[in-house]
UniProtKB/Swiss-Prot annotation:
ATP binds at G423, P424, A425, S426, T427, G428, K429, T430. It is found in: Host nucleus. Residues 193-197 are annotated as: Ori-binding. Its cofactor is Mg(2+). The keyword Transcription regulation applies. Multifunctional protein which displays endonuclease and helicase activities required for initiating and directing viral DNA replication. Also plays a role in viral packaging and transactivation of several promoters. Binds site-specifically to 2-3 approximate tandem copies within the origins of replication (Ori), unwinds this hairpin region and nicks one DNA strand thereby initiating the rolling circle replication (RCR). Becomes covalently attached to the 5' end of the nick and provides a 3'OH for priming DNA synthesis. Pfam families: HBoV_NS1-like_N, Parvo_NS1. This is Initiator protein NS1. PROSITE patterns: PV_NS1_NUC, SF3_HELICASE_1.
Length: 776
């Protein structure tokens, strides 16, 4: 083109825009002070400009004055100071004296302040540090202005009013270097969804086209734009003005503004004709949009979560996937995710909110019983279960108790929403209650010490544990609602009261919970309604110290067996156990005949009716007759029963003497004997599911074949014994009978028979062997 203007066809990115105000409020009234401080020698020209006529009238004096004031007025000096300061700032960012950047500075006379627009783009300036750089930029601009003011001191000292402006500039400079900008520098910002402000990058060429260039010139508030702007360079529709413009260190003259604007519109920035408008021009009629298109285009955009929300959602998914219920579970399962969320503002509070949301989700989805089965799936009840053993020791039917616990935990027991384990110390009540609540895991505890907020920990829980329960008149009324499963509002510390839904309660205590204590009085008014809400089990037998703790999996085994076998509702419980109503004191168990509550007899399993252990079954084939293996070398004269003979034992030993058993177990068990392998109950407990691999399949086939061989050998042995017993035996003659009686005939004729031994020494025969075993 025919002009030499500082045309920008490309601008460095990213680009940000600043606005710097001149820090003097009464600058319009004291405009002459700015003339003398920043542009000395231009006072007379500015006064003459006030008296010039506006265009379209021809005024040669006006043209000469405007040419003389080209870049010497205080607006131009202010724009130069801003450019030098911005260039210095970019040099610091890029660590060079000659930074590679693009800078546009335009000073303007506003309604309140003299200000300067700065467009700067280049490496070293980013979205993160552009906002922080405001104080540095303001300090550099104020330093340039104070240096400009000091040039006047070479000719004359400051007037008092001039000194006031100078000291104000120095004060703003000191505050800027300390980080305080006041309201003297601003940057274009945007607000995010959280309300935080961030630096807004801009399109510099479009900003030049639409905001910087289409303005008329005004160099003094006492003049007018039609005086300071020539008719050829007048923007008809522009209502804003500028004072001076600098692009990359060169002034943009008034006569070149329109040409530069036209070049930006036609060549640099694509216009509407080049866009995808179907070939229509900028002023042509746009296509009509139908109603259906408006409806379809009125769809809401997808919400994009920020970093904090994504972390919270990930943590909530982890809690649901891994069943994380408390802070300790988060530390052990996902510490990396926990640390990232802790690093966010208010991270501890966010973690509490996530856990609270997960608790609400679990309570809405599960009951205490279903969540217990969710945590402990596919449990098989065995006769070595400690929960089964404890209930049998205390005299209860463990299956009936398990049925009742299932109904309570599943919220199907009607008004009886509480199970109370009552008894003295060391009877297993806390052991049993702790196993139940730890199996559920999401439980709350009642705290007597915090008297104002006793049930503070009971909200958003699947089950409540009331350890060492004690009724007091301060909390007996809400306690009756909670024990009966009625919804009520409870007080929570530092929060409003919350609604407590029906939550099963487990109590372990050695106090009388039906007596209400208040001050120095004990009341029994609430005893009847409390008993209607509580199902009490009395544990009165102390357990040995070697009993051990009941694990949550053992509780899950018992409850899962009862849940699969019985109808876990109030009607099903009463129908199964033939009850008209469920009493407050749980009924004692009634064992079947020959069934025992002794844990030493647990190998054969338990009864599915009374819960007792099944009796032992013995096999006579593993025993043999001792008399058949006794020889004369093993003869013991003490077994004769003769008190006159010599005996080394004392009378006390004779009194306590118990004859030896006539049967004994064979020391070496035959390999085909049923006792040589595991029992049938042990085999069934071991192979309750299919083998998981080839090794387990091989072991299963070996044990199964061994059981088949044992069964076959036992049947063959029984048949052989039966056949031997049915064979005809020859009738013994008198001589044979005499030999059996210990009488032999004499070798010499006429002599009496010889008696070999006394009848007292005769061993019992096979016929009376069973009568003498274990008897005297």
């Amino acid at each position: 083109m025919a002009f030499s203007a500082p045309v920008l066809r490309a601008f460095s990115q990213p680009t940000f825009t600043y606005v710097i105000k001149f820090p003097y409020n009464n600058w319009k009234e004291d405009e002459h002070l700015l003339w003398s401080l920043l542009a000395p020698g231009t006072e007379s020209l500015m006064i003459q400009l006030k008296n010039c006529a506006p265009h379209p009238e021809d005024d040669p004096i006006r043209e000469d004055i405007l040419c003389s004031l080209a870049d010497l007025h205080y607006g131009a000096v202010f724009a130069k100071a801003c450019y030098i300061a911005t260039s210095t700032l970019m040099g610091q960012k890029q660590r060079t004296l000659f930074p590679r950047c693009d800078i546009v500075c335009q000073s303007e006379i506003g309604s309140d302040f003299l200000h300067c627009h700065i467009l700067v783009g280049g490496a070293g300036l980013s979205k993160r540090n552009a906002k922080i750089s405001r104080a540095t930029l303001l300090g550099l601009v104020m330093a340039e202005l104070t240096q400009r003011c000091k040039l006047l001191l070479a000719h004359r000292p400051f007037e008092p009013a001039e000194a006031t402006i100078y000291h104000e500039l120095k004060r703003i400079e000191r505050e800027a270097w300390s980080g305080h900008t006041g309201n003297w520098v601003q940057i274009l910002q945007y607000k995010d969804k959280r309300g935080d402000l961030h630096a807004q990058p801009i399109d510099p060429l479009r900003f030049l086209k639409h905001y910087i260039l289409p303005k008329n010139r005004l160099i003094s508030p006492s003049s007018k734009p039609d005086v300071c702007t020539s008719p050829d360079n007048w923007f008809i529709l522009a209502d804003k003005t500028y004072s001076h413009t600098i692009i990359n260190g060169l002034p943009l003259l008034e006569r070149n503004r329109k040409a530069y604007l036209q070049e930006l519109e036609s060549e640099v920035i694509p216009g509407p004709s080049a866009m995808a408008f179907g070939g229509r021009g900028a002023w042509e009629q746009l296509p009509e949009v139908g109603e259906q298109r408006l409806i379809t285009s009125n769809t809401s955009t997808a919400y994009k979560a920020n970093k904090k929300e994504k972390l919270m959602l990930n943590l909530l998914d982890k809690c649901d996937e891994l069943n994380l219920l408390v802070y300790e579970d988060l530390v052990s399962a996902c510490p990396d995710l926990l640390l990232m969320l802790e690093g966010q503002p208010g991270g501890a509070r966010l973690i509490e909110q996530v856990l609270g949301m997960h608790h609400i989700k679990v309570c809405a989805k599960h009951t205490a019983l279903s969540f217990l089965f969710h945590l402990h799936p596919d449990q098989l009840l065995t006769s070595s279960n400690k929960a089964l053993k404890l209930l049998l020791i205390q005299g209860y039917n463990p299956l009936q108790v398990g049925h009742a616990i299932c109904c309570v935990l599943n919220k199907q027991m009607g008004k009886q929403n509480t199970i109370c384990f009552y008894g003295p110390a060391s009877t297993g009540k806390t052991n049993f209650a702790k196993a139940i609540v730890q199996g559920v895991r999401l439980y709350g505890c009642v705290n007597h010490l915090n008297k104002g907020f006793v049930f503070n920990d009971c909200r958003q829980r699947l089950i409540i544990w009331w350890e060492e329960c004690l009724m007091h008149q301060d909390w007996v009324e809400p306690a009756k609602c909670i024990l009966g499963g009625t919804e009520c509002r409870i007080d929570v510390k530092h929060k409003d009261s919350v609604l407590l839904q029906q939550t099963p309660v487990i109590i372990s205590t050695n106090h009388d919970i039906y007596s209400v204590v208040g001050g120095n009085t004990v009341s029994h008014v609430h005893a009847a309604p409390l008993k209607e809400r509580v199902l009490q089990l009395n544990f009165m037998k102390q357990l040995p110290q070697t009993f051990g703790e009941i694990s949550p999996s053992e509780i899950a085994e018992l409850l899962q067996w009862c849940f699969n076998e019985y109808d876990c509702t109030l009607a099903g419980f009463k129908q199964k156990w033939n009850l008209d109503k469920v009493p407050n004191s749980f009924p004692i168990g009634d064992l079947c005949p020959t069934h025992s509550q002794d844990f030493t007899l647990h190998e054969n399993g338990f009864c599915s009716d009374c819960g007792g252990y099944l009796p032992h079954s013995a096999d006579d084939s593993v025993y043999t007759d001792v008399a058949s293996e006794t020889t004369s070398g093993d003869y013991d004269p003490g077994n004769l029963g003769d008190t006159d003979g010599e005996d080394s034992k004392s009378e006390a030993s004779e009194v306590d003497y118990c004859p030896p058993k006539k049967r004994r177990v064979i020391s070496a068990t035959p390999p085909n004997s049923p006792v040589s392998g595991p029992s049938l109950s042990t085999f069934l407990d071991t192979w309750q599911s299919q083998p998981r691999d080839d090794d387990e399949l091989r072991i299963y086939e070996e044990q199964a074949s061994q059981f088949q061989k044992n069964t076959k050998s036992t049947s063959e042995r029984e048949e052989a014994q039966l056949g031997e017993s049915q064979e005809p035996q020859p009738e013994p003659d008198p001589t044979a009978w005499g030999e059996k009686l210990g009488v032999c005939s004499s070798q010499q004729p006429g002599q009496p028979p010889i008696v070999l031994y006394c009848f007292e020494d005769l061993r019992p025969s096979d016929e009376d062997e069973g009568e003498n075993i274990g008897g005297d």
